[in-house]
Swiss-Prot record:
The keyword Disulfide bond applies. The keyword Chaperone does not apply. InterPro entries: DiS-bond_Isoase_DsbC/G, DiS-bond_isomerase_DsbC/G_N, DiS-bond_isomerase_DsbC/G_N_sf, Thiol:disulfide_interchange, Thioredoxin-like_fold, Thioredoxin-like_sf, Thioredoxin_CS. Required for disulfide bond formation in some periplasmic proteins. Acts by transferring its disulfide bond to other proteins and is reduced in the process. DsbC is reoxidized by a yet uncharacterized protein. Also acts as a disulfide isomerase. Belongs to the thioredoxin family. DsbC subfamily. Homodimer. It comes from the Bacteria. Keywords: Disulfide bond, Periplasm, Redox-active center, Signal. It is found in: Periplasm. This is Thiol:disulfide interchange protein DsbC. GO terms for cellular component: periplasmic space. Disulfide bonds join 119-122.
Length: 237
């Protein structure tokens, strides 16, 4: 028994060493390109790793010699599945406590919207919130300042997200009533970085519960129809 335990420990150490060696090669290759990785994980493809960076998701061979940028799709089922964004959903849900939520009384769907208070179509979407909610669509907001993290929009949205009543502060900003300065430990950069990783490049960007991203504004009825159809397709019904 003792010998078997020692052998298991030895094998674990060997495989751990191999994993760290692979990661080291990957980090070295990324460093040459000026890319900083936040996390390296296993990928669905043998011989490759998934690398999370602040500028998106990469797939890198274990030896660090080849890099693929962009989403990976699983086409083994009836419909393609974006496995890259599906992976990122755990990070999105980790920000749930920071989201500004408009919950539908009879919830049928939940969407997460990356928004910017300076975006015209974001205003249009928010003006129709009662219609989305009436159709059973719960809307959760994360901030995505299009002009960057040092912009006035970023500062204003941080104040909104730090307000005692975030929903009222957001409603007021969208109604043109201005933003009252406030501070807290909410980091808008986390919202922004996740948006970039999900492939968001403009607002509003609507993320479904499985990581599928719908770029741009969708009216309440159009959104409901799309969500119903998407749910049917992905559930196989």
């Amino acid at each position: 028994m003792k010998k078997r335990f020692m052998m298991f420990t030895l094998l674990a150490a060997v495989f751990s060493g191999v994993a760290h060696a692979d990661d080291a090669a990957i980090r070295q290759s990324l460093a040459k390109l000026g890319v900083q990785s936040t996390e390296i994980q296993a990928s669905p493809v043998a011989g490759m790793k998934t690398v999370l960076t602040h500028s998106g998701v990469l797939y890198v061979t274990d030896d660090g010699k080849h890099i693929i940028q962009g989403p990976m799709y699983d086409v083994s089922g009836a419909h393609p599945v974006n496995v890259t964004n599906k992976l990122l959903m755990s990070q999105l849900n980790a920000l749930e406590k920071e989201m500004i939520v408009y919950k539908a009384p009879d919830e049928k769907h939940v969407i997460t919207v990356f928004t910017d208070i300076t975006c015209g179509y974001c205003h249009k979407l928010h003006e129709e919130m009662k219609d989305y909610n009436a159709l059973g669509i719960t809307v959760r907001y994360l901030a995505f300042p299009r002009q960057g993290l040092e912009s006035q929009a970023e500062q204003d949205m941080k104040s909104i997200w730090c307000a005692k009543d975030k929903n009222k502060a957001f409603d007021d900003a969208m109604a043109g009533k201005g933003v009252k300065p406030a501070s807290c430990d909410v980091n808008i950069a986390d919202h922004y970085a996740l948006g970039v990783q999900l492939g968001v490049s403009g607002t509003p960007a609507i993320v479904l519960s499985n990581g599928y991203v719908v770029p741009g504004y969708q009216g309440p009825k159009e959104m409901k129809a799309f969500l119903d159809e998407h749910q049917k397709q992905t559930s196989g019904k």
